[in-house]
């Protein structure tokens, strides 16, 4: 049986994260947080389900910026600016590739919640819990998935939450990075894909979303 993979939109994620967890078990909240780490890192579950303090470091980034020269109107002076960036370093278990993922504010907030040592749950448990959360979030949009049986393909309408699993996090992260306008060569440095071609096969943005991305980025279509 073959099933088309899905990804969660920004709107889906907002609903997913805003579910009232008091109506579910503590395990559901942990599963949701682990899943969201997978989204923000765009890693496989074997990597995002094991992140701890040893994987996290803070880097000091120095850059040169031009600022107005207070003593010479219309001129600028170069100034060195420093900023700290929290980074997750992972050696991917499947490929052995080393990747470094800058922490977004959302990701850092989750890591801080667990004192930078994420709890671990079995994959099957995460899969069960995140489906519960997806249902509670109202992710009941009908998705036509393709099932193959005996060499015959058939489209089967299925509620979206039933298709959420641990790998959805990685696909969601990669797709949202792409739709945000991030360069594919930068994305593969994070995801560990071997080439942009492999990444593009992985991204699940539909035609309308791709058109929206292109027309926002390029004035050619104005």
What is the predicted role of each segment?
Residues 28-32, 127, 167-171:
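Short, leucine-enriched amphipathic alpha-helices that occur as contiguous helical runs
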Residues 1-45, 49, 124:
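Basic, Lys/Arg- and aromatic-enriched nucleic-acid-binding interface segment
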Residues 15-21, 59-136:
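Basic, alpha-helical nucleic-acid-contacting "clamp/cap" segments
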Residues 92-95, 184, 191-216:
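Catalytic-site neighborhood detector that most strongly recognizes the C-terminal catalytic loop/helix
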Residues 14, 42, 46-50, 101, ...:
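Feature representing long, continuous alpha-helical segments
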Residues 23-24, 116-120, 131-189:
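Short, basic (Lys/Arg/His-rich) helix/loop patches that form interaction surfaces
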Residues 38-79, 186:
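Short, charged phosphate-coordinating catalytic segments
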Residues 16-19, 75-77, 201-222:
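DNA/chromatin major-groove-contacting recognition/catalytic segments
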């Amino acid at each position: 049986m073959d099933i088309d993979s899905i990804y969660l939109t920004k709107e889906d994620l907002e609903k997913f994260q805003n579910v009232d967890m008091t109506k579910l078990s503590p395990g559901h909240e942990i599963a949701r947080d682990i899943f969201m780490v997978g989204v923000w890192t765009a890693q496989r579950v074997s990597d995002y389900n094991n992140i701890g303090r040893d994987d996290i470091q803070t880097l000091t980034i120095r850059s040169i910026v031009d600022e107005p020269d207070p003593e010479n109107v219309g001129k600028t002076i170069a100034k060195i600016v420093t900023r700290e960036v929290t980074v997750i370093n992972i050696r991917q278990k499947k490929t052995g590739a080393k990747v470094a993922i800058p922490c977004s504010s959302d990701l850092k907030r989750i890591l801080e919640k667990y004192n930078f040592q994420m709890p671990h749950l079995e994959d099957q448990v995460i899969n069960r819990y995140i489906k519960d959360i997806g249902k509670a979030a109202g992710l009941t949009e009908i998705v036509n998935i393709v099932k193959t049986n005996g060499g015959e393909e058939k489209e089967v309408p299925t509620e979206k939450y039933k298709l959420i699993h641990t790998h959805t996090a990685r696909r969601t992260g990669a797709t949202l990075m792409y739709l945000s306008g991030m360069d594919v060569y930068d994305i593969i440095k994070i995801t560990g894909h071997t080439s942009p071609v492999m990444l593009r096969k992985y991204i699940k943005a539909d035609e309308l979303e791709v058109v929206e991305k292109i027309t926002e980025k390029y004035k050619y279509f104005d």
